[in-house]
Amino acid sequence: MRTLWIVAVLLLGVEGNLLQFNKMIKIMTKKNAIPFYSSYGCYCGWGGQGKPKDATDRCCFVHDCCYGKLTDCSPKSDIYSYSWKTGIIICGEGTECEKKICECDRAAAVCLGHNLRTYKKRYMFYPDFLCTDPSEKC
């Protein structure tokens, strides 16, 4: 389900934050978010529940928590500015929401890059119904 939603968004030509986040992930991991992170574990992709499966999935859990704190922002659609140089992502100027959203995405992309060694193919396209452990608090 998570994969279908992300593919639908991309097919509709949305130019917002999800595409920017995808680019950040590509910069830090050298992998495309789709298919590698669009439905990985219990938290990478749309939604999330249960206990993160590994450090890679925990990056997505923390990212979800970060977005959850931005109650007055639109983190999945607001466009922000950022740049990168030799693998370092720098969030640019903008509204407070844009800066905070960018920082959530930057931190998650950096986390995914730092945890490439924990990535396990068995958690790609992981079904939600297997995420039954009690969810952790942010």
Swiss-Prot record:
Record keywords, A-Z: Calcium, Disulfide bond, Hydrolase, Lipid degradation, Lipid metabolism, Metal-binding, Myotoxin, Neurotoxin, Presynaptic neurotoxin, Secreted, Signal, Toxin
Record PROSITE patterns: PA2_ASP (PS00119), PA2_HIS (PS00118)
Biological process (GO), any one: negative regulation of T cell proliferation
InterPro entries: PLipase_A2 (IPR001211), PLipase_A2_Asp_AS (IPR033112), PLipase_A2_dom (IPR016090), PLipase_A2_dom_sf (IPR036444), PLipase_A2_His_AS (IPR033113)
Pfam families: Phospholip_A2_1
Intrachain disulfide bonds: C42-C131, C44-C60, C59-C111, C65-C138, C66-C104, C73-C97, C91-C102
SMART domains linked to this entry: PA2c (SM00085)
Entry cofactors: Ca(2+)
Leading EC class: hydrolase
Gene Ontology terms, MF aspect: calcium ion binding; calcium-dependent phospholipase A2 activity; phospholipid binding; toxin activity
Described purpose of this protein according to its UniProt entry: Snake venom phospholipase A2 (PLA2) that displays edema-inducing activities, as well as presynaptic neurotoxicity and low myotoxicity. PLA2 catalyzes the calcium-dependent hydrolysis of the 2-acyl groups in 3-sn-phosphoglycerides.
Localization per Swiss-Prot or TrEMBL: Secreted
PANTHER family xrefs: PHOSPHOLIPASE A2 FAMILY MEMBER, PHOSPHOLIPASE A2, MEMBRANE ASSOCIATED
Organism: Protobothrops mucrosquamatus
Organism phylogeny: Eukaryota, Metazoa, Chordata, Craniata, Vertebrata
Name of the protein in its database record: Basic phospholipase A2 trimucrotoxin
GO cellular component, one term: extracellular region
Family: Belongs to the phospholipase A2 family. Group II subfamily. D49 sub-subfamily.
Reactions listed under catalytic activity: a 1,2-diacyl-sn-glycero-3-phosphocholine + H2O = a 1-acyl-sn-glycero-3-phosphocholine + a fatty acid + H(+)
Organism domain of life: Eukaryota
E.C. number(s) listed in UniProt: 3.1.1.4
